[in-house]
């Protein structure tokens, strides 16, 4: 038996050497520039995603490679990455059917949702069934519902924090329960009362943050996902305590969806699962599990991203008096009784017309990015970038963050400057500046809930900053500077978020 060990070792070395030679010289990707070690092995990415620094650092490594090798590089044995702000909208255009990677679709354990659908054709069918719920017109109809959530939040602030100068509010938590309540109601048709949780610390919203931490482990070792799914729920919850809160939320909604499937008033619609059950989708697309995954994916994806954007905006409004003062001047023209914490709020139609408020939201979107991870896809047809042709079936990707820090488009790009969005500005190439705001991505897989997210941001900022004053507490720029990729952007480990105290009613 032992005499086979040298033979096995030689066989293994021969295979490894042959694989390296193929990847360096014979692979369809061999012609693309980039570091040779990354072309040979995917362990470079694994090391930087899991072990280097605080993890999630590969995005910064291949940024350095781009500076050395150019705008198109090979970042691992099977993937080409492009860094060119002008090409983002072209690559992810609505006219180009692109496929998600099957192993990445399994990372969040929701393969039946539109978010994780691999096939562009199936994705189109699934998206069409619910897209009418997220049109601008439909969101406008729900303006009062969004305002009601913000009014409930304002009441909580007045009851529990107003007059208690030393009580600290984590704005990240506050905005998370606001967005989660709204999105869950939109998805499931139920008010969950996240806003009513003590200190705005809801188990569900906390779970969303913590469950993204092992994202790269699942991406680098997809087989782990299958193993974990096979484990009993009790074991999973022991290994990851936040899974218990998430599973409790899932179980409650599965029962609710099952009831909705047979409800007499299902035709009234208004939720994602009623839209699915009432659609012309084939029967296999109307299963309770698929409807549940669709709604849950939307709720999970929308809650944290909107809250992060609102937290970035809140920091800068509290950090820079000039920005706050200019917003106050604009709001004074539309808020009827701006001296009262009970001031009635303008309609969404009016808020959408405010240029400086729009500039604040656009800057917050630009500096919160939406997704911090690269967006890998494949195509059945060749992709042409300058003189480079990416063959069919080869993985290619781009990121949002580099475009948002392209100094040709956004000078002084790390500074928060709402005024850069005023007076219909143009980029260096003559295109509207908004064409380079990619927080909601682009193409057929762009964010389904964009209009709802924007409505939440407009109403949230106006309601809070018309009604309240606060002071930053033990918070600085490092708490909104994102230095880790966890699919969503993350600040340094140890950051406690954007925190404030000394809450008072607004005085003009």
From Swiss-Prot:
UniProt-listed Enzyme Commission number(s): 1.-.-.-
Annotated GO MF terms: heme binding; iron ion binding; monooxygenase activity; oxidoreductase activity, acting on paired donors, with incorporation or reduction of molecular oxygen
CDD domains: CYP58-like
Top EC class of this enzyme: oxidoreductase
Keyword Zinc-finger tagged: no
Keyword Phosphoprotein attributed: no
The protein's required cofactors: heme
Induction notes from the record: Coexpressed with the other cluster genes on brefeldin A production optimized medium.
Pathway: Mycotoxin biosynthesis
Chain sites annotated for binding heme: 447
An example Gene Ontology biological process: mycotoxin biosynthetic process
InterPro entries: Cyt_P450, Cyt_P450_CS, Cyt_P450_E_grp-I, Cyt_P450_sf, Cytochrome_P450_monoxygenase
Keywords: Heme, Iron, Metal-binding, Monooxygenase, Oxidoreductase
Membership in a protein family: Belongs to the cytochrome P450 family.
Job of this protein: Cytochrome P450 monooxygenase; part of the gene cluster that mediates the biosynthesis of brefeldin A (BFA), a protein transport inhibitor that shows antiviral, antifungal, and antitumor properties. The proposed biosynthesis of BFA involves formation of an acyclic polyketide chain that is differentially tailored throughout the backbone.
Protein's UniProt name: Cytochrome P450 monooxygenase orf4
Organism: Eupenicillium brefeldianum (Penicillium brefeldianum)
């Amino acid at each position: 038996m032992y005499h086979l060990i040298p033979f096995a070792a030689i066989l293994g070395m021969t295979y490894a050497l042959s694989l390296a030679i193929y990847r360096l010289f014979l692979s369809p990707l061999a012609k693309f520039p980039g570091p040779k070690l990354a072309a040979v092995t995917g362990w470079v990415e694994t090391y930087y995603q899991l072990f280097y620094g605080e993890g999630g650092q590969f995005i910064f490594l291949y940024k350095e490679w781009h500076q050395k090798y150019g705008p198109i590089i090979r970042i691992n044995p099977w993937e080409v990455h492009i860094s060119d702000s002008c090409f983002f909208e072209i690559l992810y255009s609505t006219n180009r059917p692109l496929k998600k990677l099957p192993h990445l679709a399994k990372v969040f354990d929701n393969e039946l949702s539109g978010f994780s659908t691999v096939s562009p054709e199936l994705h189109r069918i699934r998206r069409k069934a619910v897209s009418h719920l997220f049109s601008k017109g439909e969101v406008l109809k729900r303006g009062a519902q969004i305002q009601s959530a913000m009014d409930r939040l304002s009441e909580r602030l007045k009851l529990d924090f107003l007059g208690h100068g030393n009580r600290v509010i984590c704005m990240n938590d506050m905005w998370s329960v606001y967005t989660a309540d709204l999105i869950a109601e939109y998805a499931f048709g139920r008010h969950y009362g996240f806003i009513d949780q003590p200190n705005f610390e809801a188990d569900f919203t906390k779970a969303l943050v913590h469950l993204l931490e092992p994202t790269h482990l699942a991406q680098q070792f997809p087989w782990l996902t299958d193993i974990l799914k096979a484990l009993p729920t009790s074991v999973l919850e022991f290994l990851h305590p936040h899974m218990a809160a998430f599973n409790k939320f899932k179980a409650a909604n599965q029962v609710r969806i099952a009831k909705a499937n047979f409800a007499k008033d299902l035709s009234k619609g208004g939720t994602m699962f009623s839209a699915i059950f009432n659609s012309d989708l084939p029967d296999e697309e109307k299963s309770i599990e698929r409807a549940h995954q669709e709604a849950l994916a939307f709720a999970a994806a929308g809650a944290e991203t909107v809250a992060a954007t609102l937290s970035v905006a809140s920091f800068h409004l509290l950090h820079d008096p000039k920005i706050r003062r200019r917003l106050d001047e604009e709001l004074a023209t539309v808020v009827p009784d701006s001296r009262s914490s009970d001031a009635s709020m303008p309609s969404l139609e009016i808020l959408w017309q405010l240029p400086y408020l729009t500039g604040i939201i656009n800057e917050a979107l630009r500096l919160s990015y939406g997704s911090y991870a690269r967006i890998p896809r494949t195509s059945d047809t060749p992709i042409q970038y300058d003189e480079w042709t990416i063959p069919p079936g080869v993985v290619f990707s781009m990121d949002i963050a580099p475009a948002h820090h392209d100094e040709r488009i956004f000078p002084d790009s790390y500074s928060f400057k709402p005024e850069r969005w005023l007076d219909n500005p143009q980029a260096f190439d003559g295109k509207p500046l908004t064409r380079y705001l990619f927080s909601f991505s682009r193409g057929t897989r762009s964010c389904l809930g964009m209009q709802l997210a924007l409505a939440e941001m407009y109403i949230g900022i106006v309601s809070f900053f018309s009604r309240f004053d606060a002071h930053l507490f033990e918070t600085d720029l490092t708490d909104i500077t994102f230095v880790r990729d966890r699919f969503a952007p993350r600040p340094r480990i140890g950051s406690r978020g954007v925190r404030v105290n000394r809450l008072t009613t607004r005085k003009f």
